[in-house]
């Protein structure tokens, strides 16, 4: 059996971008997105929002649809930002920037709401990443974060994809709930809500192979955090 190459995020998303739409396109993403949208304020009118690790722009679309006055998307992958340009129609309400979660190219306290969906696992160190998300969010503002649930890697699941007929995996670090709790407590981020969504069997394509265990365990870990100071 040929080993699946494990790529760093920039290399991986350069290959993945051409087939990566601006919506949840697999059962895990749909479960994660339902959890994140349930924790997101319904009315974002007048608010500045930030999508850190915006990819092709799926959460930017949701926030603009909920009335955000201005949305900024940041991503490390030039290919994914190019995809977002094609997918989004935010006009002057949306700005896209190349940058890393380790040094977001935005001013302190810019966002009323910061979203970071399924990205934190691409970085080895959780606390500095949360610190940077907090810096970009105003005091009293919200940070919504999600990641692949640590149960997944423990069961041998990988974040993988196909490009040009070949399968690849994306490098991923495992962050336990205890790591999140400790980092938030140290930084002054209040954990207001935690969700651990399960797969919806209706999202699994007919005839597709799925590990039966995947229907019995959480597939994502999602947090609603508030910057206290």
Each predicted region: which residue ranges?
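Conserved class I S-adenosyl-L-methionine
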Residues: 1-44, 58-62, 80-83, 142-171, 198, ...
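Conserved Class I S-adenosyl-L-methionine
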Residues: 191-229
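Short alpha-helix
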Residues: 172-195
């Amino acid at each position: 059996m040929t080993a699946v190459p494990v790529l760093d995020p920039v290399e991986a998303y350069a290959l993945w971008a051409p087939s990566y739409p601006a919506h949840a396109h697999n059962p895990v993403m749909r479960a994660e997105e339902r959890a994140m949208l349930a924790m997101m304020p319904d009315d974002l009118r007048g608010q500045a929002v930030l999508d850190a690790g915006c990819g092709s722009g799926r959460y930017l679309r949701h926030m603009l649809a909920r009335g955000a006055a201005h949305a900024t998307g940041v991503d490390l992958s030039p290919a994914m930002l190019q995809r977002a340009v094609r997918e989004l129609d935010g006009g002057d309400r949306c700005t896209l920037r190349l940058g890393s979660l380790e040094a977001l190219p935005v001013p302190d306290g810019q966002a009323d709401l910061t979203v970071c969906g399924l990205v934190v696992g691409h970085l080895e160190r959780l606390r500095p990443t949360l610190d940077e998300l907090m810096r970009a969010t105003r005091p009293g503002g919200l940070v919504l974060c999600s990641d692949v649930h640590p149960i997944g890697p423990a069961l041998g699941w990988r974040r993988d994809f196909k490009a040009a007929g070949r399968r690849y995996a994306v490098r991923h670090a495992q962050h336990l709930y205890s790591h999140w709790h400790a980092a938030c407590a140290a930084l002054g981020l209040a954990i207001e809500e935690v969700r651990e969504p399960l797969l919806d069997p209706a999202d699994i394509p007919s005839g597709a192979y799925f590990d039966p265990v995947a229907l019995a365990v959480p597939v994502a870990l999602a947090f609603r955090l508030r910057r206290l100071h």
